[in-house]
């Protein structure tokens, strides 16, 4: 269900042809499937209420004929008329209206429950699926645009489910029942009415055709505006540092103007629909009134005053749902545009995981054999099921090997070439090199954020493609280049590394990372609330918490992606002491800005344009006087 849209060269937001929804019928069916899956009985009850309400309104209009011909007109010919029969008739008419009102009230109440429940389920499915998407998706889609799917696009469905669809169903039932009722009263006046209805439908179709493309573009432009706002909020410090407030505002105005134009065009067309249909309805009403009166006075057929009054009431009740159908059509078009974006995200392929080797708690039995256990022992093993039905267990050691690995973020552009390296348990492997050399890319391959095109990566001798991704990542401690902290207490952020960790284990991890000192100086210590990605902490403090979070997971392999790149010298010394203790006995892959932080690495791997050009210890590489020597003696940094 792709949306056809072509962007040519030009400034931000330059547009090609206007997009249009493909397969609207398929989209609508998919939306209704979401509703019926959990609320089919409710929808049947809503349909019953709509039918009762529509028939009550029709019956009330037909009752006007009886009221006029059998009660009011005869009373005008009596000198002392009795109002008792008329009062009884009015009571019956009020009862009919009351039934219609109660049915409409029940319909509205039930639809609120159906709509909100469906949207809750849809948001849950959307979020669940989002969690299964590969990192590649988030690297290639603006986060604000993704947020717009949850907010604006889902809200268009709320309007459609709670208002448009019930109104459309009610209008169709009303139109059908009123049509047959009008035919029973006067086929001549029915023909007059239908001629005006044909004109109303023609006008509505032309207006809807003109506005639909703008409603779709409006949703797109709204997503762009949300994406831009979120991006600028995240980068507000950078904007202010470089004093780019005016340029940022200019960019926002450009996107905001695009949104204004598409919204103006969409609503300009849709807003004239109701007045046009209302005036055509009034013309139809006037023509029927004049024609009916002439027929009644001329004694044509069985036309009476009551028939004319009843028919005019039905005429009004017929034209109104026609106008409502036209108006709700625009709401449905907007909702379909939002639904297309929702389902497009839900149809994104989930992260592929064909692994079958899992990570389990283990212990040694009496025969000194590794066996699986439900209790946490601190000893982990790879559980490897085989085709013959047997299962073997291998102790988790932390041995990582790359063999002839090639990789590109896009197939036609390889960024890593023939990578061969290994990290033995307890070794510290450091990556250095210029910007874009491939250092971070290698770490992304270890945790399978991306998968290689050629070669093999083995973990404890097991091809990592055979290991379930969740278990693979559970065995890795990762400190990312951009530290992210969640809204919550300091303790909760540390515990994120292992949710079942006790407070004592979290505090021990903080001490290991040398974070305990500054945490205790916070207003509430470990219970201090962090908001806005830990904006009330320094960059160094945030990275210390990230290291503590990795430490509490107690992994055999560490990936430190430029963990100390933004820390001052004093804080770096604290971190380095903590990290030396954390890395002891663990395989560690480290990327750092300062080459001084990797001097004690067991092996330093020098990368250039995706290839390993040097490897060895610090002293060995200095003696070679190659690229590493140039970086080190020239006081250059890798990034």
What are these regions (language model features)?
Residues 79, 362-639:
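ABC-type nucleotide-binding domain
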């Amino acid at each position: 269900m792709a949306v056809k849209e072509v962007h040519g060269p030009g400034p931000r937001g330059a547009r090609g042809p206007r997009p249009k929804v493909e397969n609207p019928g398929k989209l609508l069916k998919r939306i209704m499937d979401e509703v019926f899956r959990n609320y089919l009985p409710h929808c049947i009850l809503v349909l019953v209420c709509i039918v009762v309400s529509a028939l009550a309104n029709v019956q009330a209009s037909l009752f006007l004929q009886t009221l006029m011909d059998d009660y009011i007109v005869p009373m005008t010919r009596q000198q002392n008329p009795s109002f008792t029969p008329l009062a009884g008739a009015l009571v019956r008419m009020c009862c009919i209206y009351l039934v219609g009102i109660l049915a409409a009230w029940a319909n509205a109440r039930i639809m609120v429950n159906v709509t909100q429940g469906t949207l809750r389920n849809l948001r849950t499915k959307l979020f669940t699926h989002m969690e299964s998407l590969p990192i590649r998706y988030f690297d290639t889609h603006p986060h604000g645009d993704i947020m717009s799917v949850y907010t604006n696009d889902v809200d268009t469905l709320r309007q459609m489910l709670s208002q448009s669809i019930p109104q459309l169903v009610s209008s169709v039932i009303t139109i059908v029942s009123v049509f047959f009722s009008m035919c029973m009263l006067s086929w001549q006046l029915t023909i007059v009415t239908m001629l005006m209805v044909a004109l109303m439908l023609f006008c509505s179709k032309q207006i809807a055709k003109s506005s639909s493309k703008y409603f779709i573009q409006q949703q797109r432009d709204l997503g762009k505006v949300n994406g831009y706002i979120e991006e600028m909020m995240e980068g507000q410090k950078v904007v202010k540092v470089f004093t780019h407030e005016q340029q940022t505002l200019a960019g926002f105005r450009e996107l905001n103007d695009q949104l204004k134009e598409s919204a103006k065009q969409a609503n300009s067309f849709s807003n004239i629909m109701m007045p046009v249909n209302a005036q055509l309805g009034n013309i139809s009403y006037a023509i029927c009134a004049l024609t009916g009166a002439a027929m009644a006075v001329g004694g044509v057929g069985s036309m009476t005053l009551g028939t004319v009054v009843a028919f005019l009431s039905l005429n009004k009740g017929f034209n109104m749902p026609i106008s409502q159908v036209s108006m709700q059509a625009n709401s449905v078009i907007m909702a379909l545009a939002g639904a297309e974006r929702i389902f497009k995200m839900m149809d994104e392929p989930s992260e592929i995981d064909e692994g079958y080797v899992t990570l389990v708690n283990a212990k040694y039995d009496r025969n000194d054999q590794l066996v699986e256990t439900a209790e946490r022992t601190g000893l982990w093993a790879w559980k490897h099921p085989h085709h013959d039905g047997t299962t073997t267990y291998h102790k988790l050691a932390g041995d990582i090997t790359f063999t002839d690995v090639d990789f590109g973020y896009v197939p036609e552009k390889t960024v890593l070439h023939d990578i061969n390296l290994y990290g033995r348990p307890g070794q510290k492997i450091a990556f250095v090199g210029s910007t874009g050399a491939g250092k971070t890319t290698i770490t992304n391959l270890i945790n399978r954020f991306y998968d290689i095109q050629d070669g093999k990566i083995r973990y404890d001798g097991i091809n990592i493609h055979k290991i379930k991704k969740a278990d693979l990542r559970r065995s890795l401690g990762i400190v990312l280049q951009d530290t992210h902290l969640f809204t919550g207490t300091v303790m909760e952020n540390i515990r994120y590394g292992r949710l079942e960790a006790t407070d004592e284990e979290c505090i021990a991890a903080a001490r290991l990372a040398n974070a305990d000192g500054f945490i205790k100086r916070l207003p509430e210590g470990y219970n201090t609330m962090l908001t806005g990605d830990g904006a009330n902490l320094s960059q160094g403090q945030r990275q210390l918490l990230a290291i503590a979070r990795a430490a509490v997971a107690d992994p055999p392999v560490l990936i430190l992606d430029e963990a100390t790149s933004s820390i001052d010298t004093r804080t770096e010394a604290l971190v380095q002491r903590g990290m030396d203790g954390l890395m002891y006995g663990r395989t560690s892959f480290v990327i750092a800005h300062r080459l001084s932080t990797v001097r004690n690495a067991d092996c330093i791997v020098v990368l250039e344009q995706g290839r390993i050009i040097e490897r060895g210890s610090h002293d060995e590489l200095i003696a070679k006087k190659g690229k590493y020597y140039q970086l080190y003696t020239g006081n250059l940094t890798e990034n």
